Swiss-Prot record:
Organism field: Spiroplasma citri
Name of the protein in question: Polyribonucleotide nucleotidyltransferase
Keywords: Cytoplasm, Magnesium, Metal-binding, Nucleotidyltransferase, RNA-binding, Transferase
Cofactor(s) the protein needs: Mg(2+)
InterPro entries named among the record's database cross-references: ExoRNase_PH_dom1, ExoRNase_PH_dom2, ExoRNase_PH_dom2_sf, KH_dom, KH_dom_type_1, KH_dom_type_1_sf, NA-bd_OB-fold, PNPase
Name of encoding gene: pnp
Keyword Transport part of the UniProt annotation: no
Length: 702
């Protein structure tokens, strides 16, 4: 197969696709370059039908640290398990691709993204999504694409920027990922600085304009190198099974679906499913594999009855499983100070969804070190989300976080990061853990609400409280209904999970996943409007529990003292091989000390006496004088701009001419003379250690 190269200018930069040279044994493969970002993406299908009752799609995002000129850290010096960024990138791409496969397609498909080179100006996730869609589209794999994505930000003047650089994202009002087909949007992921619903909608639609260009380019390539799609056996339920289920269990299943209490509803449905399988006249001649397949068909037919009834209720009757109105939020409950000892805790309950969030404060030196392909080297704010099986009344796996738990934690972190105070304002590392205790839908948004409460209870001076809500959609052709605060079954049987989080002022994060091909502007607009109304209602509940962050930290939280030392004294404070700083820590009851490059020193400990001891030890080395201190010394030099006073050994300070007297002074010699003994006050020590003084009085000569 000869190598073929395709090129197109997208957003003033060349997008290059190579096909036919690399990874030729995969079902589809492309090498895509945009700027200096290069990815090799393969799509492979298993020709045998799997025995699972869902479409087995896997997206693997392989970060190679050589792509950014790094050698991996650690003892092994090679890539290990995916980083958080890799996991989240794979989820974004998966969410854009999955709606474009038939739900009855049961052959295993694996997308492998090899990140080969990365620059700071071209987002590797968007290049990877484009390449993944193209690899699928030119292959034999049945795929209703192509699909593409765009990265969008909005600058401070509300100008929309497509495919922004890292600097533009950091300076902008949002980081928005939009994905979709040429006709509709099917995935949105955004973090934003309290933007309006209208501005967010404009940015989403602007991103879709670029998506259409990318899809047109894919169509050009598909026409030249695409191959016919494979003949596949789509999963389907046999007519006799549908008849058996409808005749014997449809009425009871519909009644069960209307039970308001989740646990009772699920138990009743599960019992009916067990009875249907047990009572079905299973031919004894069937093999174990055939019996398993028939059981899957029975379960599917039974679940389809529930699905049709729930969707009919919402679309036609405009009623919901638990009797709520379409825009009604479940009962809300908020509590703080749930736990002793910890630095901050809160419990948030919405219906049968309940989350406990706990805040822990630590020294800046306890931040998370990141070894990946992004420019981020560390972070001082973390939000971790745990979803144990008991939260849905089941037994199950306990261990490292799943991809879903990582994703939900990251969404909460994206929201909360917008309201976390800067390091200068609040020099602590902050970790929040959200423990899901009960789940009936939208636990990620409940964790945001609980985390906000816990932060305020902990005394973290957040800029504004933030809460979240999950919206849903039921759509049949042109008839659709939007739901506020979806519960688990509405999420499972619906067409959209649309999460919106923000403050009273605006949106801080947005995440949309759908199961249909896409949605239009009108649905987006309506969902955003309803989400804002719900958000403000939840915010009232949070503020009724605690109206503002506490002005003090918990007694168990580490106390801290921050001060500046001259930059040229940092080395002396640390000492050769760290001996001096180690000695200070040991003499001060194991305090934690952080020293920044600009000379900012922060000392942490539970006891103020230990902090003060460490402060005095550092001061003796690096700060022979402090602001406010009064010192007597001789005038050693006179200049046009002021006079220098000798303070201590190897240490002089400057009295600027404007600080010699209250009235205007023409010449310094009009006030003081060389060798005069003066009393001065230290008024400032700048970042370079230069000492500025104010004259108090000239002492009489002896």
């Amino acid at each position: 197969m000869a190598k073929q190269v395709f090129k197109k200018i997208i957003n003033n930069q060349e997008l290059i696709v190579e096909h036919g040279q690399l990874a030729k044994q995969a079902s589809g493969s492309v090498l895509v370059r945009y700027g200096d970002t290069v990815v090799l993406v393969t799509a492979t299908v298993n020709n045998k039908l799997s025995e699972v009752d869902f479409f087995p799609l896997t997206v693997v995002f392989q970060e190679k640290l050589y792509s950014v000129g790094k050698i991996p850290g650690g003892f092994l010096k090679r890539e290990g398990k995916p980083s958080e960024y890799g996991t989240l990138s794979a989820r974004v791409i998966d969410r854009a691709l999955r709606p474009l496969f038939s739900e009855n397609f049961r052959n295993e498909v694996q997308i492998v993204i090899n990140v080969l080179a990365v620059d700071n100006d071209n987002d590797v996730r968007m290049v990877s999504l484009f390449a993944a869609s193209l690899a699928l589209s030119i292959s034999k794999i049945p795929f209703a694409g192509p699909v593409a994505g765009a990265l969008v930000t909005v600058d401070q003047k509300n100008n929309i920027i497509i495919n922004p650089t890292l600097e533009q994202i950091n300076d902008g009002q949002m980081e928005l990922i939009v994905a979709g087909t040429d006709e509709a949007i099917n995935m949105v992921e955004a973090g934003a600085k309290e933007v309006s619903e209208n501005l967010m909608l404009q940015a989403i639609l602007a991103g879709h304009d670029v998506i259409q260009q990318l899809i047109a380019f894919q169509h050009e390539i598909i026409a030249k190198v695409g191959v016919p799609k494979m003949e596949v056996e789509l999963f389907q339920v046999r007519p006799e099974i549908i008849t058996y289920v409808n005749n014997n269990y449809a009425k009871d299943l519909i009644t069960a679906a209307r039970i308001k209490e989740k646990t009772k509803r699920y138990e009743t449905i599960e019992h009916l499913i067990e009875q249907a399988i047990k009572n079905y006249p299973m031919p004894v001649s069937l093999s174990e594999k055939e019996q398993k397949q028939l059981t899957v068909e029975l379960k599917t037919a039974l679940h389809n009855i529930i699905r049709q009834e729930v969707r009919r209720q919402i679309l036609i009757d405009k009623t919901r499983l638990d009797g709520r109105k379409l825009d009604q939020i479940r009962p809300l409950s908020s509590e703080i100070d749930i736990l002793p000892v910890v630095h901050g805790s809160a419990l948030f309950t919405r219906g049968e969804t309940q989350v406990l969030s706990v805040v822990t404060l630590g020294a800046l030196g306890e931040n998370q070190i990141i070894d990946g392909i992004t420019d981020e080297e560390s972070k001082r704010f973390m939000h971790h989300y745990n979803f144990p099986a008991f939260s849905v009344g089941e037994t199950g796996r306990m261990g490292p976080p799943s991809r879903r738990e990582i994703g939900h934690g990251a969404l909460g972190e994206k929201v909360l990061l917008q309201i976390i105070p800067s390091e200068k304002v609040f020099p602590y590392t902050i970790r929040i853990v959200s423990e899901v205790l009960e789940s009936n839908g939208s636990t990620s948004q409940a964790s945001i609400c609980a985390a906000t409460l816990a932060l305020m209870a902990a005394g973290v001076p957040i800029t504004a409280p933030v809460v979240g809500i999950a919206m849903g959609l039921i759509k049949e052709k042109n008839n659709y209904t939007i739901l506020t605060d979806i519960q688990g079954m509405e999420d499972h049987l619906g067409d959209m999970d649309f999460k919106v989080a923000g403050t009273a002022t605006g949106i801080c994060a947005l995440q949309m996943d759908i199961k249909i091909v896409g949605i239009n502007k009108a649905i987006l607009q309506e969902a955003l409007k309803a989400a804002k109304k719900a958000r403000l209602t939840i915010l009232d509940n949070v503020l009724a529990t605690i109206s503002a962050p506490r002005t003090h930290l918990a007694p168990t939280a580490p106390k801290m003292k921050t001060f500046m030392i001259p930059v040229d004294k940092i080395r002396e404070v640390i000492g050769p091989g760290g001996k001096m700083i180690t000695a200070i820590i040991e003499k001060s009851d194991d305090v934690k000390i952080d020293i920044e490059d600009d000379g900012q020193v922060t000392i942490y400990h539970k006891e103020t006496t230990a902090i003060e001891k460490a402060y005095q030890l550092i001061k003796a080395i690096a700060m022979p004088v402090v602001v406010g201190e009064k010192i007597i010394g001789p005038v050693v030099k006179i200049e046009k701009f002021g006079v220098f006073v000798h303070l201590k050994e190897n240490l002089d300070g400057l009295i600027h001419i404007s600080k010699l007297a209250k009235q205007h002074v023409e010449k310094a010699e009009d006030i003081v003379q060389l060798n005069d003994i003066v009393k001065v006050k230290v008024i400032e020590i700048d970042g370079k250690g230069k000492i500025k003084l104010q004259l108090i009085e000239i002492l009489p000569k002896k």
